[in-house]
């Protein structure tokens, strides 16, 4: 088990497994921060950031609280741009009940001067060792309560725009394990459709609900991908339905999805815009037969 971080961590300001992300752009922000007079952070909430009435401007330094839902720190890379990307997601759990506006992604990008032969993901993990925020993200545990300070940001994603918190120059304060663990929101898988066609346009539910924890009940699987072990679910076991991305499950060890037509009492996962929209279960326990 990872050790809980009980101290404030501050990035060194050095710079901001699996399939490559299918999106129109990666996080390339590399802001200049004056550490002598850092801007005061605006205290807000994840629900307020995701609200249609949100008026907070991109780049505003904000402070929010949430509970970690990521089973691990997600790492990707772009060797052409020379960046490593790190991500975790959190949800607001108070006040209850849970809503589809509870989730948000924490992102960090670190510049890498050169790549060597070998795994880019491994090199990005090594690069993270010199940045305190990147290491703090890696130390986070599911169910951990955290206070986050970073910059409100958005990202162009598969023809849509998603919200996130840029952790460049940010802070993470661990507050121990949450008293109120995340609760999934019951949702309809036929509403969470992966974008297809040309040009692809991200479904509004993924832009509006990214990072939310959802649960589909009494569904059947279809469309199994034998390479990546992803599959889709719907009430009837046929399209339309939601794509279940198994990235987290495969990253935690060997995973093979079950045959098409498998019935699940429930499938729980994180709403993510990666690959133009999918639901990522956190662990195998999120797939209940």
Walk through the language-model features, giving the residues of each:
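Bacterial N-terminal signal peptides that target proteins for export
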Residues: 1-8
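C-terminal motif of bacterial Sec signal peptides marking the signal peptidase cleavage site
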Residues: 14-17
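OB-fold nucleic-acid-binding modules
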Residues: 19-289
